[in-house]
């Protein structure tokens, strides 16, 4: 598989300007300092419900996520990244605050991502590199679901106890992980 030439940040739902929200803009700036590497962080359509039927086509046609793309997905964005990788080849997934169910939340249920079983084997077949960041003190996601994602995808898991839902403004570890992917196999 060809070396990656870009990263795409797929944000969590909730709206707000992606470029200025949380760590997204900070990571974008850091990754764009890598020569010949591009990082996209665009505002997503349908930002509140984050419907699969809207987000996945946008990832394909507007963000051009392909086999040379590292998809960095946060929360709902991590879920979109996993569903996308069920049917598309991508270079890598970097999943931040990933989970496996609608958590009994009406908005999550309406998104459509949880209407069928996960195709874990297809994700692994389409994506040779999977890294996950999770925190045991996430106020929205039970650790059990985060751990299930790591186990099912054989992800390289960075487990924290003090990062909550990763809503901080900087994310040094994520930049290091992407840089290590550019240097070759982990």
Swiss-Prot record:
It catalyses: valacyclovir + H2O = acyclovir + L-valine + H(+). The active site is at 75 (charge relay system), 138 (charge relay system), 165 (charge relay system). GO terms for cellular component: nucleoplasm. Keywords: Hydrolase. Residues 56-70 are annotated as: Retinoblastoma protein binding. Serine hydrolase. Catalyzes the hydrolytic activation of amino acid ester of the antiviral prodrug valacyclovir to its corresponding active drug, acyclovir. May negatively regulate basal or autocrine TGF-beta signaling by suppressing SMAD2-SMAD3 phosphorylation. May play a role in the transformation process due to its capacity to confer resistance to the growth-inhibitory effects of TGF-beta through interaction with RB1 and the subsequent displacement of E2F1. Belongs to the RBBP9 family. This is Serine hydrolase RBBP9. It comes from Mus musculus (Mouse). The gene is Rbbp9.
